[in-house]
Every structure is written in C-alpha cells, then in structure tokens.
Design a protein with these regions (language model features):
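N-terminal glycine-rich FAD/FM-binding segment characteristic of electron-transfer flavoproteins
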Residues: 1-190
C-alpha cells in the first residue's frame, strides 16, 4: 500500500533518514539509511526515554480517511487476563528455563517469587518447548523483548536467542548450576 521499506526495532535515530537497529540476535548494530519519502519504523522497547513534558498542547490535524478497501478482515479478538504485570511492560521479570525440570517445578518455584516481587513471568524457548508454560511467556529473539529494571533467570543456560530478548535489562540475576552457562556473561549477579 505505501510501497516503502519497513525498518524494524530501531534503537537510535541518527537523522531523518538514518536509523540504528540490532542484527545477529543483537550482537551487532546496523546503521540503515532510507531514501523513501515515507518512513515506516518500529521502535525497540525501552530504547528511548520518555519525551519531555511541556505545558503546550500538541497540534491537532484532521485527515480524510479513505473507505475500507476490504483487503483484510478481523476474524476475532481475544484478551488474556492476568493478575501479573504484562511481560513487556513489567519492571521485574522472573523467567524459568528447562533447568527447572518440569512444569510443576516452574509453578512451585517461580509463581510465589513473582507474587512477592509483583513480577511478570517469562520463560526460555526450551521451557516453552518442554510444555512448562504457554508460548506467550517466551522471552527471546522469537519471543518477547523485555528490558525491565530487574530480570531474574532461573534454570536458563542463556542461548544467544534468549539473551537477545533480555540483555537490555538494567540488572540481571542468574541462577544456574552450570558455572560456564552463557547467561553469566550478561548477568550482573550470579
């Protein structure tokens, strides 16, 4: 429809045509230039601070919206309900991995901890694939990107895809019986 390239997950704006975005699971940064007249971008969560507040109100611009061309249709809506904070917006995230051994251990160990911290629950892909938790708990390159104030990883070895989804957390605490686990390379405490 717009006939322009989309630039995803930007973490910095160099100028009106140049943006920085992660690549290779967040292990390198690419500087991308777009000469398209319209820019379509997505922003990586927590990459930018809050805009300064002002006493001035923003201008309101009226636009004419064309009629729906009928190209796509909503076939349903479903809201998930939880007493816990939403994973991508939580200040504290507690994630479990395959090292927990079972879905029962995940629930028994992590749920009381998450309640005490008012934290969201997350998981590694291995824990999701093992059936410990549903797919919407997954943190990582193929899951959700999080950057909380505190990220606690329990029983997570730290595959590069998982690290790409949580390494921007302010403080990372890792608990793993393998002292050589990659999670310790990004952990502040372990």
């Amino acid at each position: 429809l717009l006939d322009v390239a989309q630039i995803s997950e930007i973490v910095a704006v160099v100028d009106g045509n140049t943006f920085v975005r992660p690549m290779y699971a967040g292990n390198a940064m690419a500087t991308v230039r777009s000469s398209d007249p319209i820019k379509v971008i997505t922003v990586r969560t927590t990459s930018f601070g809050a805009a300064p507040t002002s006493s001035e109100s923003a201008s309101i611009e009226s636009v004419n919206v064309p009629a729906d061309p009928g190209i796509s249709h909503v076939i349903g809506q479903e809201s998930s309900k939880s007493d816990r904070p939403e994973l991508t917006a939580a200040r504290v995230v507690i994630s479990g991995g395959r090292g927990l051994g079972s879905a029962e251990n995940y629930r028994k160990l992590l749920e009381p901890l998450a309640t005490a911290f008012n934290a969201a629950l997350g998981a590694s892909r291995a824990a999701v694939d093992a059936g410990y938790v549903p797919n919407d708990y997954q943190v990582g390159q193929t899951g959700k990107i999080v950057a909380p104030d505190l990220y606690i990883a329990i029983g997570i070895s730290g595959a590069i895809q998982h690290l790409a989804g949580m390494k921007e957390s302010k403080v990372i605490v890792a608990i793993n019986k393998d002292p050589e686990a990659p999670i310790f390379q990004v952990a502040d405490y372990g």
